[in-house]
Regions:
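Catalytic core of membrane glycerolipid acyltransferases/transacylases, capturing the structured
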Residues: 53-114
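Helix-to-loop junction immediately C-terminal to a conserved catalytic motif
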Residues: 26-27, 33-63
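Alpha-helical membrane-targeting segments
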Residues: 18-41, 93-105, 178-181, 238-242
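A generic structural signal for well-ordered alpha-helical segments
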Residues: 37, 77, 101-102, 127, ...
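A structural micro-motif
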Residues: 42, 80-82, 105, 132, ...
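A generic secondary-structure micro-motif detector
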Residues: 23-24, 45, 87-88, 113-114, ...
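Structural motif corresponding to alpha-helix initiation and N-cap regions
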Residues: 46, 93-95, 118-121
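Non-catalytic C-terminal accessory region of glycerolipid acyltransferases
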Residues: 2-26, 55, 118-252
Length: 252
């Protein structure tokens, strides 16, 4: 019985050891499919791609919708590859978005109940060693205001600092409420360099700079919703049940 319990614990604590961080044929297929579907459904525009440094680097973005990773992928080149760090995702075998991203190797799951921190850190290091891009939604959960950021989780730039790679701020504007052919903008800011950051105070200051960099890319005011919003169900199509409940529960 004890042997079975140990085996179950090993399975429960597994991490993303087999994560592929190369631009594989499978990833190219995912990139092409996502790009085609997202651009069919929405009018997605990108700005600031010229700010991207040579990889590896870390992308820090706001988070308004379950569509956000795919919206970003739809406007960036197939190389360098973006791998998303998903600390809030408890089960990548459930939900359409999670299954698609997990199948194509597009996310690093990290949940304290399921994944060891060591294996997650190893996976992140693999992304940087392969000269890839690590994407993080630093708020840790979905927010519902276009012009505001939630508080960033502590250590949003910890991986970048540890590896000495730059951070690129990213703002996804227009994904809070979605409908057919809705315009969504993916904005990238100038890179923030981390190689000279030392000590806790410097890391806290870096986190503040990154948050300010993302905030500077957001609109000044909340948008007004039009009366006609065809296929408005797209808003919550890829959101989890908890996020849908929060959206519908009252003030944002």
């Amino acid at each position: 019985m004890a042997t079975i319990d140990v085996a179950k614990e090993r399975v429960r604590r597994t991490g993303p050891r087999e994560l592929s961080v190369e631009v594989t044929p499978r990833y190219r297929l995912m990139w092409g499919l996502i790009r085609a579907v997202v651009r069919l459904l929405f009018d997605v525009r990108a700005s600031g791609l010229e700010h991207w440094p040579k990889p590896p680097f870390q992308l820090v973005a706001n988070h308004h919708n379950g569509w956000d990773p795919m919206l970003v992928i739809s406007v960036v080149p197939v190389e360098p590859r973006i791998t998303w760090f998903g600390p809030r995702e408890a089960n990548f075998s459930r939900g359409f978005k999670n299954r698609v991203m997990a199948y194509f190797g597009g996310m690093i799951p990290y949940n304290p109940d399921r994944t060891t921190l060591t294996s997650a850190v190893r996976a992140v290091r693999g992304v940087f060693e392969a000269r890839g891009v690590l994407g993080i939604f630093a708020e840790g959960r979905i927010g519902f205001r276009e012009a505001q950021l939630l508080e960033f989780e502590a250590g949003a730039a910890a991986f970048a600092v540890t590896s000495g790679v730059p951070v690129v701020p990213c703002a996804i504007v227009g994904s809070t409420d979605l409908w057919f052919r809705k315009r969504v903008q993916v904005r990238f800011g100038p890179p923030i360099w981390t190689d000279a950051v030392r000590g806790r105070a410097a890391r806290l200051a870096l986190d503040a700079r990154i948050r300010a960099g993302v905030a500077a890319l957001l609109p000044d005011t909340e948008p007004r919703l039009p009366r006609r919003r065809p296929l408005a169900f797209l808003t919550d199509l890829l959101n989890g049940a908890d996020d849908i409940a929060r959206r519908r529960s009252g003030p944002r």
